[in-house]
């Protein structure tokens, strides 16, 4: 069994960090049908599903449904996020993943938001989720 699989449910991001490679790929967001097909094929082969690659998972409108479906199919869902959209996604409080990883270095690589405000938003979501 493979321990983990990284899924790019979207390649759309709300930041433009200097450390992320630039790409000319068309913007794409995975459909529920694509996610269902992919996770069905991965059942029994993978334990952890990481929602992370070149896009920001919190931009995907179906993220809560994806997390719940992954859990229902026996996966352990993990999300890596830049942390800037968490307080805008209260719907995620009903579909929390096993682990939520917050990439704080996205602040350093972007610099659009003041560090105090950035940390406050991360902490607000963490307190609401606890």
Q: What do the predicted segments below correspond to?
A:
Residues 102-130:
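Classical nucleotidyltransferase
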Residues 1-100, 109-113, 117:
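Conserved alpha-helical substructure of the radical SAM core
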């Amino acid at each position: 069994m493979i321990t983990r699989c990284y899924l790019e449910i979207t390649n759309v991001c709300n930041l433009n960090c200097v450390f992320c490679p630039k790409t000319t790929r068309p913007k794409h967001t995975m459909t529920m049908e694509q996610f269902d097909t992919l996770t069905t094929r991965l059942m029994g082969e993978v334990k952890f599903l990481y929602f992370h690659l070149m896009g920001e998972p919190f931009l995907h409108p179906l993220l809560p449904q994806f997390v719940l479906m992954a859990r229902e199919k026996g996966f352990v869902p993990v999300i890596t996020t830049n942390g800037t959209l968490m307080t805008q996604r209260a719907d995620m409080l009903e579909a929390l993943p096993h682990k939520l990883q917050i990439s704080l270095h996205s602040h350093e690589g972007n610099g659009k938001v003041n560090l105090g405000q950035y940390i406050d938003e991360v902490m607000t979501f963490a307190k609401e989720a606890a």
